[in-house]
Amino acid sequence: SDLAVGAADTPSYAMLVEMKAKAKDKFIRGIRAGGGEEVFHVFMSPQGMAKLKLDSDYLANVRNAGVRGSKNELFAGSTSVLVDGMWIHEYSHVLTPAASADTGEGAWGVKGQRVLMCGAQALAMADLGKPSWDEKDFDYNNQKGISTSKIMGMLKPKFHSIIDSGVEDFGLIAVDTA
């Protein structure tokens, strides 16, 4: 959405719960985990993760749900935390869409970041066959040439939405925050 992002619009536990509910409303499937339950992967910048760790609801949930002592993810300095079926990852290369080149501030004077929630099929990969390896001699066997080839590719799927009647990313929700 193109709504204004204010300084108070920081990542929070409530935002994560709402993102997960929105994902289920949009029929975005989670990724099947070991026990058969669905999990989502959330990516945010180190600054976004720092702001999330300062959220009182997030702190209460991680503090009380996790193990006690130094193994608690909150105190162990973990960059990935599992909360309410969402793996939250700190990632340095998260898009800051409204940032200008000189200040890092968007159109509303707020330094922002984009939080991404990825479910199943947020990324598509095609892998066609085994790689090939070819060797050839040149210059009367004084030089060897080696060639490898592999056909593969990745893309972010986009589909026509029956809900919104538009083209949208598949398996992904993006939220801009301060």
Residue ranges, per PLM feature:
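Sequence/fold signature of self-assembling virion shell proteins
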Residues: 2-25, 47-178
